[in-house]
Regions:
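Helical segment within the ABC ATPase nucleotide-binding domain
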Residues: 124-136
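Q-loop/switch helix immediately C-terminal to the Walker
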Residues: 36-48
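Conserved beta-strand-loop-alpha-helix hinge in the C-terminal portion
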Residues: 165-191
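ABC ATPase C-loop
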Residues: 101-102
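ABC ATPase NBD coupling module
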Residues: 8-22, 52-59, 176-181
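Catalytic Walker B motif of ABC-type/P-loop ATPase nucleotide-binding domains
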Residues: 109-112
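Conserved ABC transporter NBD signature motif
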Residues: 1-7, 170
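H-loop/switch region of ABC-family ATPase nucleotide-binding domains
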Residues: 145-146
Length: 203
């Protein structure tokens, strides 16, 4: 079963889960509509899980709110509200998707290898933004990654899986003291495997 905030959401339809879960996908192109403006994408995110009727799409008050939220990303997007999202870089789109996923303060935020398609410098920026957004909004977050270095550096609990089973579960001070070689050794011992590919080591 999948339990969120005390409720079983295992079989909830996607439109109902949308008000509970925020998601950022691996592909920067998946979380936004490239043919719509930044403010229009944000408006859709704000209305996630709500009944929609016929009214003006974006009020001035909303526009001011989006401006302030975008300013927190420190990417200059607050002055590009009417820019079509398709004109943004992959890193900008992923940062926007992260912001959109957290506008409604979801019960759980899912980050599905959300930096895997980005260059190392941009990936680091998006990870830093993720940490800041999660901390400021006190969000329960699950980040999926094959990068051991990132798994150690981010979050307060680290879980490794092998063949669908949890084989490593470490948190607190033990996690803070971890190194990549330590983690490789733990995984090898728990899974019985001596293989660790480059993706796990470097991302």
């Amino acid at each position: 079963s999948i339990i969120a905030d005390g409720n079983d959401i295992t079989y909830l339809p996607d439109y109902k889960r949308a008000s509970i879960l925020g998601r950022v996908f691996q592909d920067p192109m998946m979380g936004t509509n490239p043919n719509m403006m930044i403010e229009e994408n944000m408006a859709l995110a704000m209305r996630r899980g709500q009944r929609r009727g016929l009214k003006w799409g974006i009020s001035q008050k909303e526009r001011e709110f989006y401006h302030e939220q975008l300013k927190l990303l420190k990417l200059g997007l607050e002055d590009r509200l009417t820019t079509k999202v398709g004109l943004l870089s992959g890193g900008q789109r992923q940062a926007l998707t992260l912001l959109m996923a957290t506008l409604k303060k979801p019960k759980v935020l899912l980050l599905d290898e959300h930096t895997a398609a980005l260059d190392p410098k941009t990936a680091e920026k998006v990870l830093d933004m993720s940490d800041r957004v999660v901390e400021e909004n006190h969000l329960t977050t699950l980040m999926v990654t094959h990068n051991m270095k990132d798994a150690i550096a981010h979050g307060n609990r680290l879980i490794m899986m092998d063949a669908g089973h949890i084989v490593v579960d470490i948190s607190g001070e033990d996690k803070k003291k971890l190194t990549v070689p330590d983690l490789m050794a733990l995984f090898s011992k728990a899974s019985g495997s001596t293989e660790a590919n480059d993706k796990m080591l470097l991302g």
